[in-house]
Amino acid sequence: MILNVLFAVLPLVHVPAAAGASSDTLVVFVSGDGGWAAIDKGISRVFTANGMPVVGLDALKYFWTRRTPGDASRDLERIIDETHKPRVVLAGYSRGADVLPAMISRLPAATRAKFRLVALLGPSPRVELEFHVADWLHSSSRGVLVKPELEKLTSEHILCLAGEDDRDSLCPQLRGANIDVVILKGSHHFDGNYERLGRIVLEHLK
């Protein structure tokens, strides 16, 4: 589905659709600081079972080197273009959710027109486009604000998911006709109920 050269230059994970299932939709999933971990794998299984292949971007590896929003946006565009799917779901967890708005807002209109949904799982108010080991220990007060970037996405359907015990989540602050906010039981890791997260994303597809 993707040219091998893209795998050579970006830390990508390809999860093919389940045998016998097909869809015209690609899911691009940007992971959190833990890399391609249990939450990303668990949610992706729901997508692939419904015929949607997943291309995962390992945020731990990708943002180990500092990136500009323009850099990240161009790489996202390359991923979407190389897969040749007419419709796309963008999903991100934690840092992946934090960076997606800035990546999307810099994409061409023709690319953005493909998006069925932008699913943000556990986004925080700020993001820095470089990983620091200290980020594993506490939330960062550095970086750029996520909400102003998100407010630029007026034509996208946004789904924001947060755990009710996640005090750092941006979701409760969001308002807008194109934004759905869902607060679930649990913390930033959603109590490990990843299948339910995947099902909720599917329910919000347009």
Task: Locate the predicted segments by residue.
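Gly/Ala-rich beta-loop-alpha elbow adjacent to hydrolase catalytic centers
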Residues: 91-100
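Hydrolases whose catalytic domains are alpha/beta-hydrolase-1, hotdog thioesterase
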Residues: 99-103, 129
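The feature captures the conserved acid-bearing segment of alpha/beta-hydrolase catalytic domains
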Residues: 125-178
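Active-site nucleophile loop of the alpha/beta-hydrolase fold
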Residues: 59, 117-129, 163, 186
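C-terminal catalytic histidine-bearing segment of alpha/beta-hydrolase fold enzymes
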Residues: 70, 174, 178-206
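Conserved hydrolase catalytic core segment
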Residues: 103-116
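Short, surface-exposed "cap/lid" segments of acyl-processing enzymes
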Residues: 19-52, 56-59
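Conserved acidic catalytic loop of the alpha/beta-hydrolase fold
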Residues: 74-88
